[in-house]
């Protein structure tokens, strides 16, 4: 029994050590996905505006404002995630962009829907545990704590 308890403890220590690299990987993955989407929107802005006017059904706000806000979120929030700056807020923001994207598509294919679920799930640890030790958040916390 003592062997199992020690093994469990050592495994916990290893996983604690790997938490920050795992959070970094999560931040980089989510940032890459959303930043690429934002660049696509910027690259063909006229088409982006048409999509927001006729394809996406963003609730409450006008289509043009939704296009600007969504694109800004897809460009700015990933940069914050890469550097681990305001990681929890950036994770929440990315999650909101993700949720609005799913809600605004009336006929989202199952594969695309599943990808949005994955991106949301990957963002959750960032929201709950922050950016980790490999981040500007950790640097600033040490400096100003």
Tell me the role of every PLM-derived stretch.
Residues 50-64:
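Extracytosolic (periplasmic/ER-lumenal) interhelical loops and adjacent juxtamembrane/interface segments
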Residues 43, 47-51:
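A glycine-rich, hydrophobic loop/mini-helix early in the fold
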Residues 1-43, 60-72, 76, 82-145:
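Extended, low-polarity transmembrane helix blocks
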């Amino acid at each position: 029994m003592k062997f199992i308890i020690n093994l469990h403890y050592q495994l916990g220590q290893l996983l604690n050590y790997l938490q920050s690299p795992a959070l970094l990987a999560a931040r980089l993955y989510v940032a890459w996905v959303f930043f690429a989407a934002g660049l696509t929107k910027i690259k063909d802005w006229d088409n982006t505006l048409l999509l927001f006017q006729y394809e996406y059904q963003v609730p409450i706000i006008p289509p043009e404002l939704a296009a600007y806000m969504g694109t800004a979120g897809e460009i700015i929030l990933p940069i914050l995630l890469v550097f681990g700056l305001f990681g929890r807020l950036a994770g929440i923001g990315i999650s909101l962009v993700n949720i609005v994207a799913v809600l605004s598509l009336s006929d989202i294919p199952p594969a695309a829907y599943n990808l949005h679920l994955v991106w949301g799930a990957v963002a959750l640890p960032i929201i709950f545990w922050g950016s980790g030790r490999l981040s500007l958040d950790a640097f600033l916390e040490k400096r100003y704590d």
